[in-house]
């Protein structure tokens, strides 16, 4: 499986993402600069965290206009797995691929520490290696990770089982403690915590590795079955 790691001005988690795929999983990964216009040669798309364009105007608001973004939307429409982490999640929201918006954390402070997540849906291509209700430890690093949506949108997320992860405790004021959601089709995941920073027990947790393993496992099953 071959992954594209999108690199924008201000990205700072692209190397971690590349390491998780290339070194920990042994899969192919390439950095793709934001000026590129095609992702056709890739099987999966990863949008890492950071501060794209300095978070000016609004997190992800400028990045959504990058040359590569139409190709990201095309990949999502084609059913390819698309993962956005932290700033990547915010960008996916700005693109309209995922619902909701991000506000400043409730205490107006930047949070950078390991947190408990609860796997709410283990039937997605990103979470199938976890158990439903499993408690995992993944680090966060954000100042604007307070997920917000209106009641109607929240009801839809719950009804469609689109909430992939919630926080074990309220860390930032997110509606329903939401930490990660998928689109209705289930092939686009956005999450504020950083699974790429939890792929080796030496770093405190390897719980994030299962997420990347799930992507590869489901991709292989699908492509072997259709080959």
UniProtKB/Swiss-Prot annotation:
Known EC number: 6.3.5.3, 3.5.1.2
Superkingdom to which the source organism belongs: Bacteria
Compartment(s): Cytoplasm
Swiss-Prot/TrEMBL catalytic activity: N(2)-formyl-N(1)-(5-phospho-beta-D-ribosyl)glycinamide + L-glutamine + ATP + H2O = 2-formamido-N(1)-(5-O-phospho-beta-D-ribosyl)acetamidine + L-glutamate + ADP + phosphate + H(+); L-glutamine + H2O = L-glutamate + NH4(+)
Gene3D superfamilies hit by this protein: 3.40.50.880
One GO process term, biological-process aspect: 'de novo' IMP biosynthetic process
GO molecular function: ATP binding; glutaminase activity; phosphoribosylformylglycinamidine synthase activity
Active site (UniProt): 86, 194, 196
Keywords, alphabetical: ATP-binding, Cytoplasm, Glutamine amidotransferase, Hydrolase, Ligase, Nucleotide-binding, Purine biosynthesis
InterPro entries, sorted: Class_I_gatase-like, PRibForGlyAmidine_synth_PurQ
Cross-referenced PROSITE patterns: GATASE_TYPE_1
Subunit structure: Part of the FGAM synthase complex composed of 1 PurL, 1 PurQ and 2 PurS subunits.
Its biological purpose: Part of the phosphoribosylformylglycinamidine synthase complex involved in the purines biosynthetic pathway. Catalyzes the ATP-dependent conversion of formylglycinamide ribonucleotide (FGAR) and glutamine to yield formylglycinamidine ribonucleotide (FGAM) and glutamate. The FGAM synthase complex is composed of three subunits. PurQ produces an ammonia molecule by converting glutamine to glutamate. PurL transfers the ammonia molecule to FGAR to form FGAM in an ATP-dependent manner.
HAMAP family, alphabetized: PurQ
Stated name of the protein: Phosphoribosylformylglycinamidine synthase subunit PurQ
Species: Bacillus licheniformis (strain ATCC 14580 / DSM 13 / JCM 2505 / CCUG 7422 / NBRC 12200 / NCIMB 9375 / NCTC 10341 / NRRL NRS-1264 / Gibson 46)
Origin organism lineage: Bacteria, Bacillati, Bacillota, Bacilli, Bacillales
Gene name as annotated: purQ
């Amino acid at each position: 499986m071959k992954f594209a790691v999108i690199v924008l001005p201000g990205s700072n988690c692209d190397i971690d993402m590349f390491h998780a795929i290339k070194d920990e999983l042994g899969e192919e990964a390439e950095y793709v600069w934001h000026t590129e216009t095609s992702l056709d040669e890739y099987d999966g798309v990863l949008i890492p965290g950071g501060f794209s364009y300095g978070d000016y105007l609004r997190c992800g608001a400028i990045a959504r206009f990058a040359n590569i973004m139409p190709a990201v939307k095309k990949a999502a429409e084609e059913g390819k797995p698309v993962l956005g982490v932290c700033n990547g999640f915010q960008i996916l929201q700005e693109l309209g691929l995922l619902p909701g918006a991000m506000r400043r954390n409730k205490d107006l402070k930047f949070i950078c520490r390991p947190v408990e997540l609860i796997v709410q849906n283990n039937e997605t291509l990103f979470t199938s290696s976890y158990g439903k209700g499993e408690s995992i430890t993944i680090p966060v690093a954000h100042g604007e990770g307070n997920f917000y949506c209106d009641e109607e949108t929240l009801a839809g997320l719950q009804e469609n089982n689109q909430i992939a992860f919630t926080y074990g405790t309220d860390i930032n004021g997110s509606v329903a403690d939401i930490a990660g959601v998928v689109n209705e089709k289930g092939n686009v995941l956005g999450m504020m915590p950083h699974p790429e920073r939890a792929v080796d027990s030496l770093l405190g947790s390897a719980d994030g590795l299962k997420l990347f393993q799930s992507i590869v496992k489901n991709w292989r099953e699908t492509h072997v079955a259709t080959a």
